[in-house]
């Protein structure tokens, strides 16, 4: 296993093609932003898509034949991300993450969600361990068969079932200092 936390442009040429089983990328959103001494300026949608292509195609080459990729984006750049991802990978799903952070807006809705695109190199051969990501949920309608719980368990802390995860995430929060 290997985690690389580096500037993409500094390390990409040193990574062999087909190396990664999983890539998680959180590129600059198409906003005017100053972050840790670096400035990113918003651009036209076409220019932003070309910016994404300038490194995304190379990332796809680094993905293993059965590899997966997750790409994060806000609502303004999400459609550009989708178009660029579809040029090289198969999109399996779009996860909507409801986040607690977000700035209020006096003349608009507060932006408190982000998209996380889940894409793979080969839609017929990729790894997804659904058992590892099942959710423990409180049972609201405790069905029984022959007096025994059907698809749920009764514990000291209540009635729960393990259920398949959805593409709406509202149970993950990021500390305010991040």
Predicted regions: what is each one?
Residues 1-178:
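Core catalytic lobe of class I
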